[in-house]
Amino acid sequence: MLRSRQATNALRAVGQTRPLRSQTAVAFTQSLNKVPSNRRSEATVATASSTASGAFNSQVRPTPSPTFNQYDSKVQPLTGMSRNVTDESFIGKTGGEIFHDMMLRQGVKHIFGYPGGAILPVFDAIYNSTHFDFILPRHEQGAGHMAEGYARASGKPGVVLVTSGPGATNIVTPMQDALLDGTPMVVFCGQVPTTSIGSDAFQEADIVGISRPCTKWNVMVKNIAELPRRINEAFQIATTGRPGPVLVDLPKDVTAGILRRAIPTDAAIPSLPSASIQDAMDLNHKQLEASIARVAKLVNMAKQPVIYAGQGVIQSESGPELLKKLSDLASIPVTTTLQGLGGFDELDYKSLHMLGMHGSAYANMAMQEADLIIALGGRFDDRVTLNVSKFAPGARAAAAENRGGIVQFEIMPKNINKVVEATEAIVGDVGANLRLLLPHVESRSTDDRSAWYTKIDAWKKKWPLSDYQKTERHGLIKPQTLIEELSNLCADRKEKTYITTGVGQHQMWTAQHFRWRHPRTMITSGGLGTMGYGLPAAIGAKVAQPDALVVDIDGDASFNMTLTELSTAAQFNIGVKVIVLNNEEQGMVTQWQNLFYEDRYAHTHQANPDFIKIADAMGIQGQRVADPTKIKESLQWLIDTDGPALLEVITDKKVPVLPMVPGGCGLHEFIVFNPEDEKTRRGLMRERTCGLHG
C-alpha cells in the first residue's frame, strides 16, 4: 500500500501506543510497507524503553509516545488513548476559565507574564485566583527567563502568559535559550481572533511560524473544544524526553468563547494497532542488553577511563546518585559540562571539575589521554570538544584497537554521532540505562588505577584552578577572589544555595571558582549565551525555592540588559541577592580583542549608570565595595540582608579568564596563567593603547 511519510510516521506512532485490538487490524497493519531505517556509522544504537525492568506488558505504554522525543515538524503529537468518556465539567465556561482550571489540573503554582488586549479573557479569568501566584515582570523577555530559572531550580515546567504581537515575539529569545539548554517551559500567548488572522490586524504576528525553530512543538488552538487537550499536550511534550519549550497560541475568540458541549477527556484519535510493535520492542530490548554488555566490557577493560557528565544526568531521575555509584564502583574520575555542574560533588577526590574552553587544564588533559570516555547526558558541544579533529586522540586510538573508545548515553537519537563518532551509543534516559549498566561493572579501587590517578594528580598540581594573579593591582578586587570567598561563606549551606549568572567572564569565573556539590544549584545560559539572563533567572529560582539563598553573580554589561527586573523583585519582595562585578567593559569580548585583535577595543566599553542609586530608586538595598579587605564583610551583609539586595563590586579591568583553549585548538592546547606572561601582556596592552589600558 502506498502512503506518505507523514502517514507512515503517524501510523507507527499510534501503533507504539496501542494494545492489540483485533486480528483484522493486525493483518491490515502487517500489510503496510516497511519504512527503511537510516543507517548510522559503526556505533551501535539501542533504544531504552519501558522494558528497563526486563519485562514487557503489552497493555502498558509510555505516555506520551516515544515519537514525541523525535522532531518531525510534519507530524502532530498524538497523546492519550481514545475513549468514549466525556468531560462535562467545562460546559458553560469561557476559554479563559478553562485555562484557569487546566492550570490547576496541571499543578501550576506560579505564572510569569504580561497582559495585553488579545490575552485579556485569560487574565480576567485568573483575576484574584487564590490557586497560584502571578509574577509581573517589566518585560516579556524577563518573564521567559524567570520561567527558565523556575524550571531549572524546581524541575517543573515554567509557565509564561503573554499577549499577541510584540508580547509574543519578545519571548522568542527565552524560548531559544530553553530549547538549547533543555529547559521545560510552556508559553501561552494571545492572538487576534481567528476571523482576523491574516489581515494584518493590530498586534497580529504569526508566532506559530516564528517560534517553530525555537520550540519542541507549537500549536494554535482553533476552537474552544480542543483547548484542554492542547494544554495537556503542551505540558506532556515540554517535560518528556529531552525537556524544552512549547508554545500554545490562543486566539481571542477562543479564550472569550463559551463551551456549549461535553468534550472527550483525552484526545480522541483513531487507533491502528500493529502486531509487529511487540516484536520491535523485544528486538530493541535485546539490542539494548547487548549494547550494555559491550559498554560494561569496555569499562572493565579500560585503564584510563573518564566520565564526561552533562545536564542529562541532572535532568534524569536519580541521575547524580547513579553517576556517583558508577564513579565509586569503578573509581572513574568525573568531569562535567557547564550545565552539568552540581551533578557530581566537586569535593570528591575523583572530581576533575569543568572541562572545555574555560575548563580545568587537568580535565582537558584527562579527556585527551583517556582510553575510554563515558559521556552521560552530554551532547559534545563545540565548547567541550573545541577542534573535533584533535579531540580525544587516546580514546580514538583505543577504539581502533578494540580496547576503549567513546561511549555516549543520550536521550535524543539525533545527537548520536552528530559531532563525535561514538564507539557505542545507548539511546534513552541516562538514569534508566545506568541502572542496567551498574550490575555488569566490576569493582575497581583508586589503587587499581594508581597510574591514571598519578597522572591526574600531577596535572592538578601543575595547573590548579587557584592559580591566578591574586596580588591586587592598585588595590583592586580580583573577581576570582570574591567568588571563592562567597563559596566559602556558603560552604555549610550549598544544598540550599542557588547561583545564577549572566553571560561573560563572570559566568566562567563562577563556574571555575565556586565549588559545586548539588544538582540544579548552577543556573546559567549555556547554549545560547544570553546576556541579561542572570537577574530574571534568579527571580524565577527564588520563586521556586523561597527558603533557599539565591544569588545572581552578574557582570555590569550583562546586568544592564535586564536590570529593570530589580523592580519586579522589589514589588513582589522576592529576596534575590545580586552581585554586580563592575569592570566597565564587556569583559569576555575585550579578552578576545586583547588576545587576537591587537587590543582594538571596538565598542566594548560602556558608561554605566549608578547601580546603587538605581537599586535605591526601585526600593532595594544596595552597597558598593572596592576595597579587597572588605570583601568578606560585604558578602556577609548581602547574605544576611532581608529581602532583595544588591552589592556592586568594583573589580580590576582586563583580567583574563584562564585556562582558555583558543578557537581551532585541541583541548590540550590551553593557555594558563603565568606571571611573566601576564606582565608581558599588560605591557603590550599599554603600548598598543598609548597607556589607556593595561
Curated annotation (Swiss-Prot):
Homodimer. The keyword Transferase applies. Keywords: Amino-acid biosynthesis, Branched-chain amino acid biosynthesis, FAD, Flavoprotein, Magnesium, Metal-binding, Mitochondrion, Thiamine pyrophosphate, Transferase, Transit peptide. It catalyses: 2 pyruvate + H(+) = (2S)-2-acetolactate + CO2; 2-oxobutanoate + pyruvate + H(+) = (S)-2-ethyl-2-hydroxy-3-oxobutanoate + CO2. Acetolactate synthase catalytic subunit, mitochondrial; part of the gene cluster that mediates the biosynthesis of chlorflavonin, a fungal flavonoid with acetolactate synthase inhibitory activity. Is not direcly involved in chlorflavonin biosynthesis but acts as a self-resistant protein that effectively confers chlorflavonin resistance to the native host. As a catalytic subunit of mitochondrial acetolactate synthase, catalyzes the first of a series of common steps in the biosynthesis of the branched-chain amino acids. The keyword Nucleotide-binding does not apply. It is found in: Mitochondrion. This is Acetolactate synthase catalytic subunit, mitochondrial. Signal peptide: none annotated. InterPro entries: Acetolactate_synth_lsu, AHAS_TPP, DHS-like_NAD/FAD-binding_dom, THDP-binding, Thiamin_PyroP_enz_cen_dom, Thiamin_PyroP_enz_TPP-bd_dom, TPP-bd_CS, TPP_enz. The gene is cfoL. Thiamine diphosphate binds at residue 140. NCBIfam families: acolac_lg.
